[in-house]
Swiss-Prot record:
One of its GO terms (biological process) is aflatoxin biosynthetic process. It comes from the Eukaryota. Residues 1-27, 90-136 have a biased composition (Polar residues). Residues 1-32, 67-136 are annotated as: Disordered. Residues 34-61 bind DNA. This is Transcriptional regulator dmxR14. GO terms for molecular function: DNA binding; DNA-binding transcription factor activity, RNA polymerase II-specific; zinc ion binding. Transcriptional regulator; part of the gene cluster that mediates the biosynthesis of the dimeric xanthones cryptosporioptides. Keywords: DNA-binding, Metal-binding, Nucleus, Transcription, Transcription regulation, Zinc. It comes from Cryptosporiopsis sp. (strain 8999). GO terms for cellular component: nucleus. It is found in: Nucleus.
Length: 436
């Protein structure tokens, strides 16, 4: 029985092939020209079964079937029509679903498999609903038409050059900030840097898709790392507030002199710093502090010229009452004038205050001399820089001048003003002492 069945199957094969050849020959059409005329590229008389031209030459006249362009219908048929019907029905069901219609515009192309990248699912609520369903998963037949196998060269991303460290200890806020800069949205469920042991691999994969981050900071001129400038500004603020307090109330000269001496020592300590010695900003602030100290010296020198307090005047009058001069006439008693007593006492105190201030001005003189030498060294240094840059040092305003700094001429003018103020104060005090 088995041999008979095999024989019948073998016999049926050529019958089918003969039938298909007959059908093909019936559907095909003979050429208009014979093969000999077509090869010679001449016009054929189109006589059948043999044309007159072939008979005259004695060649064999053959008419072949014409070959039409295009594919044949028999070869285009699917070998498995049932599978094609199943795939078509699944496509139709997915297109009719509301989730598919809502995500057609936002659905990106497949990125990569899990073996190549950790970011296969985009961060989108509508897309997430499609992937969660068993019918709409990536493994469903509706994704068979898409090729999900990509090589590493399909998505070439620039390397990351970021100044911060992407360590697994960062919180989710950093991940959200990274999602904003990524070329496509990322899923937080796929990036578990802080809770999963594969955080480092996630970071390395994420670094491959981040765009290149280059610092855009502009070069800045040299800034000293010390806090001398900030300390000098605080001292200048303190002296300014103290000057306002001196103008509102009567402060004794010894207190002002002690505060000025302490301020001078602070400035000397700041000027001894090697980091800010060549910077023009601290030198300018030091000059302003020196002017404020001279202003307080002037206030201390003329403090007693404003008159004494009422209780001090009464005490002075009581002491001077012992010097009452009584004339020989009992009816006439001459008492010293109250204004003359106060004036004499004020002059004595003013002279003492002026002498104290004049004795303390040598500290200020030493400070001004040190400031002047620093300004001169700074001017020489700036001159050498300009000579190197511009080829000459006679002009600061032309060419490539120094960025964010005072010129040497400005510092020299400030130093000259400080020295003139010191000279004027000492001259006024000496003149006042000579007059009294």
């Amino acid at each position: 029985m088995e041999e008979a069945e095999t024989n019948t199957q073998v016999d049926s094969v050529p019958s089918n092939s003969v039938r298909s050849g007959a059908e093909l020959s019936s559907k095909s059409k003979l050429r208009d020209s014979c093969h000999a005329c077509a090869r010679s590229k001449v016009r054929c008389p189109k006589q059948k079964p043999s044309c007159s031209r072939c008979e005259a030459r004695g060649t064999t006249c053959q008419y072949f079937f014409s070959r039409r362009p295009g594919r044949r219908r028999e070869t285009s048929k699917s070998p498995n029509p049932e599978k094609q019907i199943a795939i078509g029905s699944s496509h139709a069901n997915n297109r009719n679903s509301p989730s598919f219609s809502s995500t057609r515009s936002t659905l990106p192309s497949p990125i990569a498999s899990d073996s190549n990248s950790n970011f296969t699912q985009p961060q989108n609520s509508s897309i997430t609903t499609v992937h969660n369903g068993p019918e709409n998963s990536i493994e469903s037949p509706c994704w068979e038409d898409f090729s999900c196998e990509f090589s590493d060269t399909d998505f070439v991303m620039p390397t990351i050059d970021t100044p911060f460290d992407l360590s697994p200890a960062y919180s989710g806020s950093v991940v959200q900030e990274m999602n904003d800069t990524a070329p496509f949205p990322l899923s937080s469920s796929r990036i578990s840097m802080g809770t999963t042991p594969s955080g480092k691999s996630s970071i390395s994969s994420y670094s491959q898709i981040l765009p290149s981050i280059t610092p855009t900071t502009t070069p800045v001129a040299h800034i000293s790392s010390c806090r001398c400038l900030a300390t000098a500004l605080d001292l200048l603020k303190t002296l300014s507030l103290a000057g306002l307090a001196d103008a509102d109330s009567l402060v004794s000269a010894p207190i002002i002199l002690a505060e000025n001496k302490q301020s001078i020592e602070s400035v000397n300590n700041l000027m001894a710093c090697p980091l800010c010695s060549g910077d023009s900003f601290p030198l300018t602030i030091f000059s302003m502090i020196a002017l404020k100290i001279l202003e307080r010296y002037a206030v201390a020198a003329r403090t007693q010229h404003q008159g004494t307090r009422p209780q001090e005047a009464e005490g002075t009058v009581e002491i001077k009452l012992a010097d009452i001069v009584i004339s020989n006439n009992e009816d006439q008693t001459r008492l010293p004038s109250h204004s003359n007593i106060v004036c004499c006492d004020d002059k004595t105190q003013a002279r003492a205050a002026a002498q104290l201030v004049l004795g303390e001005l040598h500290h200020m003189q030493r400070l001004v001399n040190q400031l002047s030498s620093m300004i001169k060294r700074s001017a020489e240094r700036d001159g050498r820089k300009l000579e190197i840059l511009n080829g000459y040092n006679d002009s600061i305003d032309s060419g490539n001048s120094m960025l964010a700094s005072f010129s040497a001429s400005t510092l020299e003018l400030v130093e000259s003003d400080v020295r003139k103020s010191l000279r004027s104060l000492s001259t006024d005090i000496i003149k006042e002492l000579r007059q009294h």
